[in-house]
């Protein structure tokens, strides 16, 4: 076992993004000093974590020196961008090495929003290939390891972002989520991870055109207030007027809520350990005065996993078939990993079933509306078992890895399909000392409610930090 973190007495200290932004504004620390400290931290821990996809340290130094975005709230606070969105002048490799790198010509829209809040990007972070797996363990690029214990996975697909935030390199990093890719790394690395409502933040054109819009951009942080502040600031730059505003969420929820607790997915009951930890949190919510009801039925029909895997495979098939057009002539599908190719083969053999699967996935929104007509919030584990060790979810056999992944991450994709917000909070620890995430979901547009409830839980049960790992009981 090896715990890896970069928390030292430098310009970053152990400040979260809000506190660091205030220190920069007040002149207590300098922008250049903060960026240099983050670079030093990245260089110290990345050899053990393998979290960086591309280092843009000189670009960050230049941005700090020029004072870019000085009027923005997070001005000078360092961050990273996940390597599946474009940053001008930097390659976008999507967690693979299946083509020769080339520089993007312009920032993506979400990159402009992230940087528009004043955050200074130090580079790009690793992910699983095209974000299809819940672990980043590419056969040639190597695994992204968990800073709490490098024998364990950092989760995925926002693996590098999760590892670097948890290790203290930066307080906040870009992430996105098409089946759990914000929430799973949050659960594995002891972080706050909010997947927002469908359409809350801008998306790349290819994601906007999907028949079921499952992808959402967001961030990973160590504190609830950092996540809340990011959405407040992002909303000032880009607003979807079809959704109620998140607004400025700064305090715990006042009203007592109707909360449903579910520990059984469409495939299985959560492991005994994770189930017990979930029920313990349900007890805390009752102590806080919320009305908690234990619900036996899972939040999706029995057909959900098969339908979602078929749709996931449709996305893999699109990457395989359009790779040369999308990524250039050097694209070589034989270099793709076994999960990507296996998913593509699966859907290629079952294309006749895809239209009905898409229809059923779309209809799941009706079920969600009915559910949240009865309850304000749904509590489930983020994943069905505690974080696995590196290698468990990356065997070469496609069917084995698919079965293990489906069983582990079965709770998270439902919110992607229905488009509702969900937040993973690091409210528990496993017997081996690894963070365990608990997931709270609400109806579309109710991110503010989830953040308020998260504030209440953060106050009632402060979570472990990697350099102060004992959870307050």
Swiss-Prot record:
Instruction: Cite the Pfam families for this sequence.
Output: Amidase
- The domain of life is Bacteria
Please give the Gene3D superfamilies that the UniProt record associates with this protein: Amidase signature (AS) domain
What is the active site of this protein?
A: 82, 157, 181
E.C. number(s) listed in UniProt: 3.5.1.4
Question: In the record, what terms sit under GO molecular function?
Answer: amidase activity
| Name the UniProt record assigns to this protein | Putative amidase AmiC
Lineage here is: Bacteria, Bacillati, Actinomycetota, Actinomycetes, Mycobacteriales
């Amino acid at each position: 076992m090896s715990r890896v973190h970069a928390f030292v007495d430098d310009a970053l200290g152990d400040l979260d993004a809000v506190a660091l932004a205030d220190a920069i504004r007040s002149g207590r620390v300098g922008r250049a000093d903060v960026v240099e400290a983050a670079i030093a931290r990245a260089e110290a821990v990345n050899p053990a974590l393998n979290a960086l996809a591309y280092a843009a340290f000189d670009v960050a130094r230049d941005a700090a020196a020029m004072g870019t975005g000085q009027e923005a709230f997070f001005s000078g606070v360092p961050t990273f961008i996940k390597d599946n969105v474009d940053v001008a002048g930097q390659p976008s490799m999507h967690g693979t090495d299946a083509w020769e790198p080339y520089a993007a010509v312009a920032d993506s829209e979400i990159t402009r929003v992230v940087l528009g809040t004043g955050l200074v990007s130090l580079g790009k972070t690793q992910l699983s290939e095209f974000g299809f797996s819940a672990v980043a363990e590419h056969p040639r690029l190597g695994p992204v390891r968990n800073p709490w214990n490098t024998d364990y996975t950092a989760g995925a697909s926002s693996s590098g972002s999760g590892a670097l935030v948890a290790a203290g390199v930066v307080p906040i990093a870009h992430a996105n989520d098409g089946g759990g890719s914000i929430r799973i790394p949050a659960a594995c690395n002891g972080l706050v991870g909010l997947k927002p409502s469908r359409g809350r933040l801008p998306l790349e054109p290819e994601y906007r055109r999907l028949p079921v819009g499952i992808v959402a951009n967001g961030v990973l942080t160590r504190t609830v207030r950092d996540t809340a502040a990011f959405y407040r600031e992002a909303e000032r730059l880009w607003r979807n007027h079809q959704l109620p505003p998140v607004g400025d969420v700064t305090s715990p929820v006042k009203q007592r809520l109707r909360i449903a607790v579910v520990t059984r997915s469409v495939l299985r009951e959560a492991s005994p350990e994770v189930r017990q930890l979930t029920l313990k949190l349900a007890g805390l919510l009752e102590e806080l005065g919320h009305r908690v009801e234990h619900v036996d039925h899972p939040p999706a029909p029995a057909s959900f996993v098969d339908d979602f895997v078929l749709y996931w495979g449709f996305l893999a098939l699109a990457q395989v078939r359009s790779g040369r057009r999308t990524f250039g002539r050097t694209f070589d599908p034989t270099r793709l990993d076994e999960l990507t190719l296996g998913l593509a083969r699966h859907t290629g053999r079952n294309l006749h079933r895809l239209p009905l699967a898409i229809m059923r996935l779309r209809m799941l929104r009706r079920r969600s509306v009915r559910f949240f007509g009865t309850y304000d919030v749904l509590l489930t584990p983020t994943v069905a078992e505690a974080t696995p060790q590196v290698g468990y979810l990356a065997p070469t056999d496609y069917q084995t890895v698919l079965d293990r992944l489906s069983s582990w991450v079965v709770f998270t994709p439902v919110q992607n399909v229905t488009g509702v917000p969900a937040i993973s909070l690091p409210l528990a620890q496993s017997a081996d000392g690894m963070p365990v995430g608990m997931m709270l979901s609400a109806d579309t547009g109710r991110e503010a409610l989830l953040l308020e409830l998260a504030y209440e839980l953060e106050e009632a049960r402060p979570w472990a930090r990697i350099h102060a790992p004992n959870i307050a009981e």
